[in-house]
Amino acid sequence: MPISLKVLAPNKNVYQGEAEEVILPSTTGQLGVLPGHISLVTAIDIGVLRLRMNSQWQSIALMGGFAEIESDEVIVLVNNAEIGSDIDVQNAEQDLKEAKLVMTKFPENEKNSEKIKALQEISKAEARIQAAKN
């Protein structure tokens, strides 16, 4: 029996369908979900959700949020998400270059909100690139 998967962002239903396997980027590492998984709620990091159906893998870039897993259902609530095949790789690579350029303006040991935001932008761009290439 396949898993029912929903990926929801505040402004859109990103994905709704079935999967034989789901791999989530939780804040404690990759979390694999198969049918009959134990129920849990977990925080989702910026990263790539991978789903397998009929031996085909699909990727979705996630921008942080939460996931609820119940036996054969996974609901992912995220700040934003993009289906890998919809991502413009060149645009994502340009975003990564720009975010890395912003990072060069900060001393290595300095911590402030602008540096944290730049680090998040790097993570987002890397997730988008990874999702687009998988």
Curated annotation (Swiss-Prot):
F-type ATPases have 2 components, CF(1) - the catalytic core - and CF(0) - the membrane proton channel. CF(1) has five subunits: alpha(3), beta(3), gamma(1), delta(1), epsilon(1). CF(0) has three main subunits: a, b and c. CDD domains: F1-ATPase_delta. Produces ATP from ADP in the presence of a proton gradient across the membrane. GO terms for molecular function: ATP binding; proton-transporting ATP synthase activity, rotational mechanism. Belongs to the ATPase epsilon chain family. The keyword Iron-sulfur does not apply. One of its GO terms (cellular component) is plasma membrane-derived thylakoid membrane. It is a peripheral membrane protein. The gene is atpC. It is found in: Cellular thylakoid membrane. Keywords: ATP synthesis, CF(1), Hydrogen ion transport, Ion transport, Membrane, Thylakoid, Transport. SUPFAM superfamilies: Epsilon subunit of F1F0-ATP synthase N-terminal domain. It holds the Pfam family ATP-synt_DE_N. InterPro entries: ATP_synth_F1_dsu/esu (IPR001469), ATP_synth_F1_dsu/esu_N (IPR020546), ATPsynth_dsu/esu_N (IPR036771). The keyword Transport applies. This is ATP synthase epsilon chain.
